[in-house]
From Swiss-Prot:
Entry protein name: Magnesium-protoporphyrin IX monomethyl ester [oxidative] cyclase
Pfam families (alphabetical): Rubrerythrin (PF02915)
Highest taxon above the source species: Bacteria
Alphabetical GO biological process terms: light-independent chlorophyll biosynthetic process; photosynthesis
Record-stated family: Belongs to the AcsF family.
Region (Disordered): 1-23
GO molecular function, one term: iron ion binding
E.C. no: 1.14.13.81
Pathway assigned in UniProt: Porphyrin-containing compound metabolism; chlorophyll biosynthesis (light-independent)
Iron in keyword set: yes
Keyword Metal-binding: yes
Species name: Prochlorococcus marinus (strain MIT 9303)
EC class (word): oxidoreductase
């Protein structure tokens, strides 16, 4: 997820920001983003009025309100080794930062819309911010059950926000929500089939969680449709290519490098990464004008070559390091240029 302000580490006991010794303080150093808020305030809802009103009512209904029981215990169900405990807690910290940063971005967009007199759009993004805050709250409670307090309100004091054009923000937000949906739902399905791997009750909330992520992606898709120029012609193809490629590349590197978390749940990280990418690429046909063509299998096959090259570069030194970097860059650029397929995504205007 993205947001509009900068970062700070977590609070263990109050006053001083720090994580327990077995966790890396860099877990709480995400990037935050700002965008063209004045341009966003000019979003033309007239071309999408019927769909917007239907989506507004769905978000207003807050179907998952009762599913997130604030009184539910989030104490771990199983004792974990010190190593597995650190793996689980690291996942919680990364996730709470991601959800809270999403809340910050949606809240800022909401405030800017309302300030510009676009009350409907402002309330629309308030609903999205509500969901992200709820998710962050549950993750924060799960961390407290581990004896860790994350000072969320102070996650925004050190790093200056990075500016992205509105089109970049919408493309990346759509993918962030949809890839999140597939991650949560696939983990949920796996744990339903393998209940002995459920080490904490937090995972019981992944089904309503993924429903929120899916709806958020649909909301962002609606916003993209209100800006037809973002998805037309060469610009639309280039934006589709760049964001699908960059999000999938990042997912492969992070999932496979953090395979210990998936191992804790009994999930093969390589197969999980592949399924998430395939499903997200397919889902993106509903929003993007172009998606990657996976029919020949080349995109997916290159993932392991890229991962190996990345690890070689990271582990190399001296004169070997630039050579390893060159090979890594060559591979990812070849993957970037692989064939795409035109979609039949609904467009307005």
């Amino acid at each position: 997820m993205t947001a509009t302000t900068a970062t700070a580490p977590a609070m263990r006991g109050g006053g001083r920001n720090e994580l327990p010794p077995h966790l890396d303080d860099n877990l709480l150093t995400p990037r935050f983003y700002t965008t063209e808020f004045d341009k966003a305030a000019k979003t033309d809802l007239d071309i999408a009025r019927k769909d917007f009103e239907a989506m507004f009512k769905e978000m207003e209904a807050d179907y998952n309100l009762k599913h997130f029981d604030r009184k539910a215990s989030l104490e771990r169900l199983a004792d974990l080794s010190p190593e597995d405990k650190a793996i689980y807690e690291s996942y919680l910290v990364r996730s709470v930062v991601s959800e809270f940063s999403g809340f910050l971005l949606f809240k800022e967009i909401s405030n800017r819309f309302k300030k510009a007199g676009r009350q409907e759009l402002g309330q629309f993004f308030t609903f999205l911010a509500r969901d992200e805050a709820r998710h962050a709250g549950f993750l924060g409670r799960a961390l407290k059950a581990e004896g860790i307090n994350v000072d969320l309100p102070n996650l925004g004091n050190k790093r200056a926000p990075t500016f992205f054009p509105l089109s970049w923000v919408l493309y990346s937000l759509y993918l962030s929500e949809k890839i999140g949906y597939w991650r949560y739902i696939l983990i949920n399905r796996h744990l339903n089939d393998n209940p002995e791997k459920v080490c904490a009750p937090l995972f019981d909330f992944f089904e309503p969680w993924c429903q929120d992520e899916n709806r958020h992606g649909d909301c962002i898709n609606l916003m993209m449709r209100c800006w037809p120029g973002m998805t037309k012609g060469f610009r639309g193809k280039l934006l589709s290519r760049f964001f699908l490629w960059s999000v999938f590349l990042t997912h492969t590197l992070t999932v496979c490098e953090r395979g210990d978390f998936y191992g804790l749940l009994g999930i093969d990280p390589v197969l999980f990464d592949e399924e998430v990418i395939v499903q997200t690429n397919n889902t993106s046909r509903n929003a993007f004008p172009w998606v990657y063509n996976f029919d020949d299998g080349k995109f997916l096959e290159m993932r392991m070559q890229i991962l190996k090259a990345f690890r070689n570069w990271r582990e190399s030194s001296g004169l070997a390091k630039p050579v390893a970097l060159s090979k890594f860059v060559s591979l990812i650029l070849r993957q970037f240029a692989l064939p795409m397929q035109k979609t039949n995504a609904v467009r307005y205007g």
